[in-house]
């Protein structure tokens, strides 16, 4: 087998973050490696005992433009890009008096950190690295003879190969190059995400440049750019995915440190994949009810119960009462501070996760000491609207996140089509039910009373079955109580036939809110009129798949 290792005799080092560079310095000194470096990196290496040649001494040209130009010079880039297995490249370097590099170590200006710090536009732009990515890409392209290192986690490996004189094999250099290209791709994607948000197309160009999709439809490039580029940083791997045979990891947005993915865990076992899915769903659900105090109990990405209360404890008791059996092993979310009274209510119930913006000290102590396995999460801010992204085979589907912000979500826009106008209390329940239906998997039917769910039918492939399920849960999960009678109902989409609405009417609901839009709307409305049941049409649908 051919030996493809190339010893490291000459290295170019230019790093913004200096952490861990000591291990490289020690190896360079031990091996007598010739080191070329820039500015503060050169100073740090010299302090560590490395004999360093400044880049400006190689190029014969000083740094200029406030440091914007340091390494952008043929004497540097020819030394990086020369393939020393190519005799012509070697000959040209000799003609120009340029020495090749065997190793390039670079990490980039902290663009994402600068954005997260809230820096102004000018300071943010200064942290867009130019020379660094150029060196990284050049060295990665020329992996035939150059090893490129961008990850400080690889410094120990590099140091050992420098010190023992073996260098890296071709396959190892390819692996390092692949990491480097991933690094610069993520860096550029982060810059692209920031510029797309802050530098939209000006109105002055609307008439001269029209963005169209592959079917000729005009598109708003700010919402759906021609290339969809995003980058997420791996936070940590998870024990497993949705099932034990699936691997999984959590990735976070590098441009902000807020949101559910950045939740602070105050107690309990590590979060699982399913914990994240359910807790995120619960977190979104309770904020649909803001500014009212709300608690949601979620399991398998569906609500077991949701309620509004005068206090967090009251909201939790009402939400739990909807379906106590299903709440076992569920996730609880609260959009206000968890009080000691609420914590005492949660204590006897087996719960996987609780998430809230804050906790009373006594409540937190009780949950931490009496429920040691309970995952306790604190998220400082409500969820933000963002793109909903779903991967399909060979592509992505991207849409706006479904929020309670459509015209039809405003009860003032509802159309009364049957029965008498709802009184104040009934209307409050209808508004609650309509806001709650967004979080229920389609086909979804939800029964509510006193601003709390009392029966939920979700995930059925026909609406009639969802109606039956909602009524059944309302009437069989409450010690024989008939909770459907006098309740209100919400449907996430129209009733295609009158049969589904009739199930609710026969169960005794007094009012129904639904989008309308069926070709048989009149049949559905007539059934409500015949029974004297109030019915409102919203004109807005909330499918959830």
Curated annotation (Swiss-Prot):
GO terms for cellular component: cytosol. The keyword Transferase applies. This is Bifunctional purine biosynthesis protein PurH. Belongs to the PurH family. Disulfide bonds: none annotated. It holds the Pfam family MGS. GO terms for molecular function: IMP cyclohydrolase activity; phosphoribosylaminoimidazolecarboxamide formyltransferase activity. InterPro entries: AICAR_Tfase_dup_dom_sf, Cytidine_deaminase-like, MGS-like_dom, MGS-like_dom_sf, PurH-like. Keywords: Hydrolase, Multifunctional enzyme, Purine biosynthesis, Transferase. NCBIfam families: PRK00881.1, purH. Residues 1-150 form the MGS-like domain. Pathway: Purine metabolism; IMP biosynthesis via de novo pathway; 5-formamido-1-(5-phospho-D-ribosyl)imidazole-4-carboxamide from 5-amino-1-(5-phospho-D-ribosyl)imidazole-4-carboxamide (10-formyl THF route): step 1/1; Purine metabolism; IMP biosynthesis via de novo pathway; IMP from 5-formamido-1-(5-phospho-D-ribosyl)imidazole-4-carboxamide: step 1/1. One of its GO terms (biological process) is 'de novo' IMP biosynthetic process. The IMP cyclohydrolase activity resides in the N-terminal region. It catalyses: (6R)-10-formyltetrahydrofolate + 5-amino-1-(5-phospho-beta-D-ribosyl)imidazole-4-carboxamide = 5-formamido-1-(5-phospho-D-ribosyl)imidazole-4-carboxamide + (6S)-5,6,7,8-tetrahydrofolate; IMP + H2O = 5-formamido-1-(5-phospho-D-ribosyl)imidazole-4-carboxamide. It comes from the Bacteria. Its EC number is 2.1.2.3, 3.5.4.10. SUPFAM superfamilies: Cytidine deaminase-like (SSF53927), Methylglyoxal synthase-like (SSF52335).
């Amino acid at each position: 087998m051919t030996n493809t290792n190339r010893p490291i005799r000459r290295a170019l080092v230019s790093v913004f973050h200096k952490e861990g560079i000591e291990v490289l310095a020690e190896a360079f000194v031990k091996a007598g490696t010739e080191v070329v470096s820039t500015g503060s990196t050169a100073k740090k290496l010299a302090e560590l005992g490395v004999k360093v040649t400044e880049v400006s001494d190689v190029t014969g040209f000083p740094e200029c433009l406030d440091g914007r130009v340091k390494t952008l010079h043929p004497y540097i880039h020819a030394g990086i890009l020369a393939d020393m297995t190519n005799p012509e490249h070697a000959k040209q370097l000799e003609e120009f008096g340029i020495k090749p590099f065997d190793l390039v170590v670079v990490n980039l200006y902290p663009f994402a950190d600068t954005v997260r710090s809230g820096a102004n536009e000018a300071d943010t732009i200064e942290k867009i690295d130019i020379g660094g990515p150029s060196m990284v890409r050049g060295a990665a392209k020329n992996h035939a003879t150059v090893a490129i290192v961008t990850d400080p986690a690889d410094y120990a490996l590099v140091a050992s190969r420098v010190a023992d004189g073996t260098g890296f094999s071709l396959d190892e250099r390819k692996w390092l190059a692949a990491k480097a290209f991933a690094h610069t791709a993520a860096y550029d994607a982060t810059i692209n995400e920031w510029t797309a948000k802050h530098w939209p197309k000006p109105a002055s160009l609307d008439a001269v440049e029209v963005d169209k999709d592959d079917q000729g439809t005009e598109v708003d490039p700010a919402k759906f750019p021609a290339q969809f580029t995003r980058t997420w940083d791996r936070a940590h791997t998870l024990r497993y995915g949705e099932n034990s045979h699936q691997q999984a990891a959590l990735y976070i947005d590098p441009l902000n440190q807020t949101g559910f993915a950045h939740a602070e865990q105050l107690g309990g076992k590590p979060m699982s994949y399913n914990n994240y899915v359910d807790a995120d769903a619960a977190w979104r659900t309770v904020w649909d009810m803001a500014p009212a105090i709300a608690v949601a109990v979620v399991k398998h990405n569906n609500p077991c119960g949701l309620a509004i209360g005068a206090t967090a404890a009251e909201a939790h008791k009402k939400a739990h009462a909807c379906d106590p059996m299903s709440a076992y092993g569920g996730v609880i979310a609260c959009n206000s501070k968890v009080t000691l009274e609420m914590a005492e209510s949660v204590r006897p119930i087996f719960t996987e996760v609780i998430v809230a913006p804050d906790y009373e000290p006594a409540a937190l102590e009780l949950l931490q000491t009496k429920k040691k396995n309970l995952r306790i999460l604190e998220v400082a801010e409500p969820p933000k609207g963002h793109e909903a992204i779903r991967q399909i085979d060979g592509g992505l589907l991207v849409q706006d996140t479904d929020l309670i912000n459509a015209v039809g979500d405003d009860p003032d826009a509802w159309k009364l089509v049957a029965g008498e106008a709802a009184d104040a209390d009934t209307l409050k329940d209808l508004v609650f039910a309509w806001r709650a239906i967004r979080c229920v998997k389609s086909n979804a039917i939800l029964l509510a009373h006193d601003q709390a769910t009392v029966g939920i039918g979700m995930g059925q492939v026909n609406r009639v079955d969802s109606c039956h399920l909602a009524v059944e849960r309302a009437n069989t999960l409450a010690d024989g109580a008939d909770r459907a009678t006098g309740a209100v109902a919400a449907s996430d989409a129209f009733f295609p036939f009158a049969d589904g609405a009739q199930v609710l009417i026969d169960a005794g609901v007094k009012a129904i809110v639904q989008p309308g839009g069926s070709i048989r709307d009149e049949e559905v409305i007539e059934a409500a009129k015949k029974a004297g049941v109030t019915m409102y049409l919203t004109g807005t649908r909330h499918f959830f798949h």
